[in-house]
Amino acid sequence: AGFAGDDAPRAVFPSIVGRPRHTGVMVGMGQKDAYVGDEAQSKRGILSLKYPIEHGIVSNWDDMEKIWHHTFYNELRVVPEEHPVLLTEAPLNPKANREKMTQIMFETFNTPAMYVAIQAVLSLYASGRTTGIVMGSGDGVSHTVPIYEGYALPHAILRLDLAGRDLTDHLMKILTERGYSFTTTAEREIVRDVKEKLSYIAPDYEQEIIDTTSSSKTVEKTYELPDGQVITIGAERFRCPEVLFQPSIIGMEAAGIHETTYNSIMKCDVDIRKDLYGNIVLSGGTTMFPGIADRMSKEITALAPSSMKIKVVAPPERKYSVWIGGSILASLSTFQL
């Protein structure tokens, strides 16, 4: 969250609401009935954490309202009545959801005006393009969204219910095979941090497995847990995000992100495919793994016609490119609410 025209968000925090597991545990702390974002994160040991956004779509409106309240009053410190608001939504977000979002903004927060933009379109704007295909992957969902001259092509949007949270769960599982135990919601957050700091995508998965088992290449790294214990992580570093290209690893019958991107392009008019292949833009936190652009390029080249020029763009700021695109859009003079 932040202000139009800024080049980076003022506030970045997880969409989490935590409630005390036991009432009255925190004696003398003036216990609140709910904690949001980083505060929920830091007190996670005594809280039960909930995620009001599932697969990119809001599923718990009361908690979502708490998050927005926290954003306005605690993070940005603004009075919502005084500011037009730009919100973003997942591709193919149901109309009822958009209406509910609008209703809360106008009735609960009394915002003077609002606009809802599609996340992928904003990411594409942030990369300086108006035509291309965005492969966006966050915490709960991934989408491939072809965009032509600034407009998303709904018939060709594909959704893949595989994203950051699934990778964290998979890493929890494969670290358990190594003899470490991570089970609670609090421990899941530790594993998420391990994933973000140490994972990478192998250029060639099979070869990487061979190289690391034959010990010609060591990929082992250490990570210190909050309690001081040090764990070692090796092949898990690339086994975890490989799921993006091979969902079958976690028992999912779905196409990987490369094949989903290809399928999305194939649903578009034959005349615009060349423009899409040449402008594949990655966006979202789950595209932050080192090696992802090269691997994506290699996999799509194998699927596409041999003469096709393929370009995969992974902007360094892609974790926040949706927000940056929103900042650009909301500060345009043509965009007057």
Swiss-Prot record:
Keyword Nucleotide-binding attached: yes
Record organism: Solanum tuberosum
Further comment found in the protein's record: There are at least 13 actin genes in potato.
EC number: 3.6.4.-
Subcellular location: Cytoplasm, Cytoskeleton
Protein name: Actin-65
Lineage per the UniProt record: Eukaryota, Viridiplantae, Streptophyta, Embryophyta, Tracheophyta
Reactions accelerated catalytically: ATP + H2O = ADP + phosphate + H(+)
Gene3D superfamilies: 3.30.420.40, Actin, Chain A, domain 4
Sorted UniProt keywords: ATP-binding, Cytoplasm, Cytoskeleton, Hydrolase, Nucleotide-binding
Family to which the UniProt record says this protein belongs: Belongs to the actin family.
Top EC class for this record: hydrolase
Any one of the GO CC terms: cytoplasm
Record carries keyword Disulfide bond: no
Gene Ontology molecular function, alphabetical: ATP binding; hydrolase activity
